[in-house]
Amino acid sequence: VAEAVADGYRAISTEPLHGKHDLQDRITQTVMPTLAQRFGADISEISLTRNATEALHLQTLSLDLSPGDEVLITTQEHPAGHRPWMVRAARHGVTVREVFIPSPLVSVEDVISRFEAEITTRTRAIAFCHVTRGGHRYPVRELCTFARERGLISLVDGAQAVGQFPVDLHELGCDAYSASMHKWMFGPVGTGFLYVRADARDRFAPAFEPGSASTGTEYAPPGTADFPVRAALATSLAFVDRLGLANVDARCRYLSNYLKDRLSELDGCTLLSGPEDLSAPGSTIFQLDGLDAMASVPLLEELAQTHIDEHQRDGHDAIRISTHVYNTRAEIDRLVDGLEAARSL
């Protein structure tokens, strides 16, 4: 992927006009059709963005809402999914309320009932993560069906979902979905996409006029973009296709289960990931007595040459570990040894 990006920059620097056109052709003829097919969408429903954060802002700021309209989000949103709604509240008088969702998730029915309990006559939309920063996997299809039956728009943050397991956007039934390609999809930094369901377009007002080469309504800025980076998505998509997302799902789950087994050997370790159907295959979250999660981040980089993420939600002083297909059991063993060493300091 890195070499594909470099090749693109060499091409566009050597021959600016033809190099750019060749890259644009690769984007429109290979990247966009493959992206749509991979995620169960029509090409016209997808706009390329620089990341999920940009896509989340675009979907949030373009949604047709009036002063006093209400949107429900959850207490587990990433800041990138929370801040755009604060902009809508400040600029347009939209009421944004948080639905408390416990960590770990209890059940599909519990998640649905918590949303249902908060709906009022002013509620117009619900917004939530497909997979949270802590690795909790929301029942997206059930939530989107719930929203549609009540005439509500559903907006999903898929930054931590795409690439961990197969995602079919039409099957999920969401109205908008934002994703990053540089995380689990092996894409170059600076790539993501926004999906807006065709039947929901009248609820999302685009901020930009479509360019001459547009395949549909533009929700992301037209004009000159980072074409070498976007064209390199063809390489990352082909790589993921060779792996097979079902195989990625299985491998990530295998490594995550091995990690959980090793963590269970540590005294005072509490797993917070929840059951398999409500947790992402490659994300494990836990709390370890005697270990400060914030302080452990630099310690584990030093002791185990491993980057981890702290997770502070619902009073938990937790740690998140992400295991992708390229990780090994030996690396997990080194991490667990590092955790024990860090706790003893």
Question: What is the predicted function of each stretch?
Answer:
Residues 1-345:
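Pyridoxal 5′-phosphate
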